[in-house]
């Protein structure tokens, strides 16, 4: 399947829209915080591409993206409210509780079986798990034996886990990878800040081949 790692934000009228940043400055022809606009007000603006060129596209709602992608895309939800500087503990907890309400039976996301949650710690994963969330997988960082032991000791079965092993396969951590694979866990690297940034096309191709030869199960790329 195709994997999309997506970010979203709340509008002023509590509509969840796809938006990586908490502001619309970088990715649209508008300015300001997402939370300062209603969904309808945001439709005045158009998205720009990675080169800053204006496109005909508007900011989409999360539920429209979920409906479009069901049965063909696995969505990896990144909760930016967890690790963004300046976000209060109250807002962080509220965002976790919002996810839980949406994933529970009757919630807006409960009908979709193609959702994965990026979590930053075993404590965050356990918060979901202890609130009865069983209909998603968790993308968690396991880039050390300490990380592996923490999840091994948790009540979360390995079948709910995909392991993010950071920016590249590290030969010194082969034992960790072997333990993960023995549990049926897939490993994922992210090259968005490394190979993706190589400007020369030939050198970038070489960098990509190097990543493929390292044999992670999944490679995250922009």
Locate each region found by the language model.
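C-terminal active-site rim and adjoining tail of enzyme catalytic domains
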Residues: 139-222
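Metal-dependent phosphodiesterase/phospholipase catalytic core, i.e.
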Residues: 15, 20-126, 130-131, 135, ...
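Active-site beta-loop-alpha junctions enriched in small/polar residues
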Residues: 9, 13, 21-22, 45, ...
